[in-house]
Amino acid sequence: MSRYTLENRRFVIGGVAVAIVTVYIIRLFTLQLMSDDYKKNADSNAFLKKVEFPSRGAIYDRNGQLLVYNQPAYDIMVVMNEAKGRIDTTEFCNALGITKEFFIKRMDDIKNYAKNPGYSRFTQQLFMSQLSNEEFSNFQEKMFRFPGFYVQHRSIRQYQTSCGAHILGDVAEVSPADIEEDDYYQPGDYIGKLGVEKYYEKELRGEKGVQILLRDARGRIQGKYMDGAYDRQPVAGKDLTLSIDLKLQALGERLMEGKIGSIVAIDPQTGEVLAMVSAPSYDPRIMVGRSRSKNHRLLSRDAWKPLLNRSIMGMYPPGSTFKTSQALTYMTEGIVTPGTAFPCHRGFYCRGLHVGCHSHAAPISLVDAISTSCNAYFCWGLYYMMGNRSKYKNPFEAMNVWRDYMVSMGFGYKLGIDLPGEKRGMIPNAEYYDRNYRGSWNGLTIVSISIGQGEVTLTPLQIANLGATIANRGYYYTPHVVRKVQDMPLDTAFTHRHFTKANRRSYDYVVAGMRSSAMKGTCRALSRLPFEACGKTGTAQNHGRDHSVFMGFAPMNNPKIAVAVYVENGGWGADYGVPIGGLMMEQYINGKLSPAGEAIAGSMQHRRIGYGPRFPGQERKAAAAKKAAAAKKAKTAKQSEADQQPKPVEAKSGEQQQ
């Protein structure tokens, strides 16, 4: 019995020993083959992988003027595996001028996978970005006391000008979504957020380099691993040359002070955008440094939406500028001829429907209808097109033919400009009206679209592109703001001609109408210019005051610039649109404004539209008025007080003064 018990114990003890050895073998296998934590730990003690950031590409205007460049900056990086429990937190915070609460929160955020998806305790993580030179100097002197913390040299953007914020855009620290979308980025990297900085991010950013450095047992750098055999040099980003003319852009922004709206100028011969103004705007120089987030938050909360690029994101009724597209459609489709005349008795009257018009001679033909901007002419044209049964089976077919013309002119779809956020506008089709009117509609139902009202909306860019298309007599290039990318050919999408459905003859008559408008019609303010300008006004109806719109180009027979101006609540097209458009033409073609032009520009710059007391410019005006009123009140009160004081009375002769 005792022998059996002894044998039993021996097996039990042996089994336990085998189990223990098996566990150790499995654990060893897991550590060595299944997990690389120990390898990473060993490597992190022996090597330091240092990322070298490339210089981001510079940005120039079309004349070679520097717009955006780089400036040295310093970031504090931390390797958590080295820093844990090895620094004096108070001394560290004092060296950087931060609070202990900030230090604790920042360290927690770094280790939070939700906020920092690429976190690893063995690699460098961003602790603090964009130190000033003074902060860097103070920290560098004491850095040896803070193991695990390193200084990373990089560059940040600087903007040479206060103009062109919506074109240039800005850069900011990557978000978790950016990191997830592109594994090139790591926490703390920078990425283009708006404008060309975003659209051309891959061209501008370059390629990161890397240095592998050797460290001793105390973590001190001993030099490059294998003399840099495994290092990779950073590749600088490519420079961009914009199509923007800085002087023209600056003039446009000056003219739009105190107004909401947009100016877009295009070179019809290339599709290059010469100027793109969106008002109100902001100074791009406030979107750099550690205050960027705060300033961006303030701008995004601003009721007047200064971050919105109205040139490509604003969808507006084009008003009477749209009549040019209708003339092209009616003529090409044979609905009208140059001699076709329609009645206008202060408007369009048909079967109880009335669309108003201003007073002018009637009946009126095509060229004069464009020159005087007759509403009735274009309403009659659409009415007869929708009702023409010799050409179209029904209004449904006629409507879709009409829409095909509009789409061929670049309406209803994104033009494809090289900026993020472009909107497509709205061009209705027959299906749209069938849905909304349950199949019960005709030419009278939709007649307002013929004069750029109703459901039709365009962006200012699309209106300017219409001007460029007319200037070219029937084709356009995709508008673009980048003229050249360093060492790269221009994208073929920007060199391809897009032809419209309208014929050349119809364009010649529309040009004649726009030239007549500039000489004696609604755009006659352009007649002062020393070159042949062509234009078309628009007064787009609105719930409040009408919008002031202009579209034109110059010179007539060798077009160099096409312009669209849109001023919200500006009233008649001739009030704001025409003078601003004329000044933009004059500046670009002549290189400067004449004395008369300068006087007009000065007057236009200081004209304000009453959007409300909180609109930029209105605040200063209201504050000045309030200050003047207070001063006047104080002066009146002082005078009243003086009047109430007893006046001295001279003693009469013989009386003794008391």
Where are these regions (language model features)?
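Periplasmic/cell-envelope proteins involved in peptidoglycan metabolism and beta-lactam response
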Residues: M1-S293, M315, A398-S408, S450, ...
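Intrinsically disordered, low-complexity charged/polar segments
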Residues: P489-A493, I600-I609
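Beta-lactam-recognizing serine transpeptidase/beta-lactamase-like catalytic domain environment
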Residues: D216-I221, Y225-D231, Q269-T321, S325-G573, ...
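Short acidic/His-enriched helical or mixed secondary-structure segments at domain edges of catalytic enzymes
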Residues: K208, A540-H543, R607-G610
